[in-house]
């Protein structure tokens, strides 16, 4: 391995040569306090920037081990260090020539604290520093060029002066703000802890008092600055927790079952639901929603007309389409509002729930009696662990009327009179939502300002009034008794069967031209997979472009490793997720990737399900 001085010499010698000569600097370099690794060098100044890493050993980084001793803390610390590096890099780097010349950048960061491959903690095994952590940081560098020739002196400055300065400012514990770092780590640990407590209290979400839910604008996810009304729980829904770091915290607990959020237009309903949707992830301190936590399997469901659907059994909701179209294996290139919403629900159930129909369901809030639950406590730990894992996957559905198909949500008395049941393919959600809970343990939180018919099926009704929440359950029940909706229930005896699907391996093809794998990600909503474009604009719980990058890689892994024409989609996703859990996200790429962020099985399934070439066979 050569040192910093020789790298500098080399760069100065490269001055004015053609850009391709930069390839020569690929390799590892011993800097005074860390190792610089140049994994990959870009082909020209306009291409994606070059991939770099620095490794700072524990005796230099000196990060106290209590900051990474639990999994939550470690993930939070990695996120924190990435943000510090980002700040220092923005401050230090500047444009130095054509194209991307001069940039030094880590992965893009938003409000969420996610497990990211941008930073890793390296613990030491030498005895003199065994309580300290080191850091590996991955980032990209736009190697400088004037036109297409190398700017050697600028490159030497960037690599041999700027990078050491950034490292020194952001990755050495002595230069960090210790209190802020601790707060980051403790906040995330508390949020994870809170999320774990939900099931035991039979809650699906918790919104802490004092939370700031509204965002600065439709394109700015930071908290609204002025005029934001802080959240206060209605007294009758108030719960308390004693967090490991923060101590007592109060807020609104949303119980398992069916919850309506009602209220006038512009009174904060959607803002509350949006915070709950993203409560499956942790947020940075100061976000305002850092203690809004949601069941980890909560899935936003919406209408998404125009999407493709591949062989999904939407028959629990939709039957007898015109022209005799099959809804047991429903294929379309262009779904309607209602069929897309039905497919979105069934697809979430397909990867979330293990058993259906007459077999016992596994939802914590579902059909198991207390008696059977007690019996289970006698069984081995392993069995309990397995059950707990399965329970963690049972979806909670989140629906907002703003993005739902009206004819999927409601069908009132008058319409039932005019259009007979046998002329209407759709069984509306209102007739299925109770069965979902009773048969499968699937809870629903539904924003519905427009139809009081739902009072009949709701367990809890929360009203938003001037951005304040009230528990109006009793009143809604009284009204439901006073004015009958007079609807005929159309849902039948039970929710119905969920048919698992086996993907046809050839229908997922990441290759393009001569390249075996060509995947490309744009922001959080577009993914190019081989020759296909996947539109994920309606998959609202992909919060970070790094998640989509990792999803793209996981799709390739799913195809190459596990799609064999026999396994179901759900089994394939289980295997991929288990690999990531045991080996880390690095198994998704052949070189050290700094731009992956952790995602959920639901979003991986969502991407596969939106691939227009996907074809499946039903597993009966
Ligand atoms: P609804 O779904 O009830 O029609 P929204 O949730 O879309 O209402 O909110 C309407 C507007 O009010 C949005 O601009 C939102 O940012 C803002 N808003 C929501 N909650 C609050 C709050 N707690 N304090 C201040 N403004 C809020
Ligand atoms: Mg709304």
Where do the PLM segments sit?
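Conserved NTP phosphate-binding and transfer environment spanning the P-loop NTPase/kinase superfamily
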Residues: 438-441, 447-620
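Flexible beta-alpha connector loops of hexameric P-loop NTPases
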Residues: 151, 322-338, 410-426
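Conserved P-loop NTPase nucleotide-binding/switch module
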Residues: 349-358, 366, 371, 389-433, ...
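N-terminal accessory targeting/assembly segments
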Residues: 1-193, 198-202, 213, 615-620
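Long, charge-dense accessory insertions within large macromolecular proteins
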Residues: 173-229, 306, 323-330, 339
């Amino acid at each position: 391995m050569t040192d910093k001085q020789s790298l500098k010499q080399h760069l100065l010698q490269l001055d004015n040569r053609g850009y391709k000569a930069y390839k020569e600097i690929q390799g590892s370099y011993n800097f005074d306090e860390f190792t610089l690794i140049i994994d990959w060098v870009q082909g020209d100044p306009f291409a994606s920037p070059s991939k770099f890493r620095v490794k700072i050993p524990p005796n230099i980084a000196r990060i106290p081990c209590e900051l990474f001793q639990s999994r939550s803390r470690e993930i939070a610390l990695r996120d924190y260090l990435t943000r510090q590096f980002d700040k220092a890099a923005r401050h230090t780097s500047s444009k130095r020539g054509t194209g991307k010349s001069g940039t030094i950048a880590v992965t893009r960061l938003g409000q969420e604290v996610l497990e990211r491959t941008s930073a890793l903690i390296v613990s030491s095994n030498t005895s003199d520093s065994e309580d300290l952590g080191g850091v590996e940081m991955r980032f990209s560098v736009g190697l400088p060029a004037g036109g297409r020739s190398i700017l050697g002196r600028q490159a030497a400055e960037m690599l041999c002066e700027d990078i050491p300065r950034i490292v020194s400012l952001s990755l050495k514990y002595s230069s960090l703000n210790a209190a802020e770092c601790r707060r980051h780590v403790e906040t995330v640990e508390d949020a994870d802890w809170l999320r774990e407590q939900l099931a035991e209290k039979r809650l699906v979400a918790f919104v802490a008092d004092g939370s700031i839910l509204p965002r600065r604008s439709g394109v700015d996810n930071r908290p609204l600055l002025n005029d934001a009304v802080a959240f206060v729980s209605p007294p009758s829904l108030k719960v308390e927790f004693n967090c490991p770091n923060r101590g007592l915290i109060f807020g609104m607990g949303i119980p398992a079952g069916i919850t309506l959020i009602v209220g006038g237009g512009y009174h904060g309903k959607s803002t509350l639901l949006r915070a709950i949707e993203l409560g499956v992830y942790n947020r940075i301190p100061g976000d305002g929603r850092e203690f809004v936590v949601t069941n980890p399997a909560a899935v936003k469901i919406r209408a998404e007309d125009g999407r493709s659907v591949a062989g999904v059994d939407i028959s629990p909701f939709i039957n007898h389409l015109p022209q005799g179209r099959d809804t047991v294996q429903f294929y379309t290139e262009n779904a309607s509002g209602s069929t897309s919403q039905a497919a979105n629900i069934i697809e979430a159930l397909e990867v979330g729930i293990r058993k259906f129909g007459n077999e016992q369901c596994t939802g914590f809030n579902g059909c198991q009696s207390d008696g059977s639950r007690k019996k289970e406590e006698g069984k081995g730990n392993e069995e309990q662990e397995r059950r707990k894992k399965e329970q963690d996957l049972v979806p909670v559905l989140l629906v907002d009327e703003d993005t739902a198909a009206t004819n999927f949500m409601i069908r009132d008395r008058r319409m039932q009179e005019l259009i007979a049941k046998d002329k209407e393919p759709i069984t509306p959600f209102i007739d299925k939502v109770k069965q979902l809970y009773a048969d499968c343990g699937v809870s629903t939180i539904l924003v519905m300002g427009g139809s009081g018919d739902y009072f009949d099926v709701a367990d809890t009704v929360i009203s938003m009034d001037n951005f304040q929440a009230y528990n109006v359950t009793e009143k809604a029940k009284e009204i439901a008794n006073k004015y009958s909706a007079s609807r005929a229930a159309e849902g039948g005896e039970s929710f119905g069967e969920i048919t698992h699907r086996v993907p046809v391996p050839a229908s997922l093809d990441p290759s393009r031209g001569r390249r075996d794998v060509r995947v490309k990600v744009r922001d959080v909503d577009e993914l190019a997979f081989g020759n296909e474009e996947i539109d994920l604009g309606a998959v609202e719980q992909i919060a970070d472009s790094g998640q989509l990058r990792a999803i793209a890689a996981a799709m390739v892994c799913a195809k190459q490793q596990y799609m064999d024409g026999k396994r179901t989609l759900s089994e394939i996703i289980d295997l991929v997720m288990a690999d990531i859990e045991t080996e880390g996200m690095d198994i998704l790429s052949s070189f050290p990737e700094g731009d992956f962020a952790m995602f959920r099985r639901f979003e991986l399934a969502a991407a596969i399900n939106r691939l227009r070439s996907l074809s499946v066979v039903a597993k009966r």
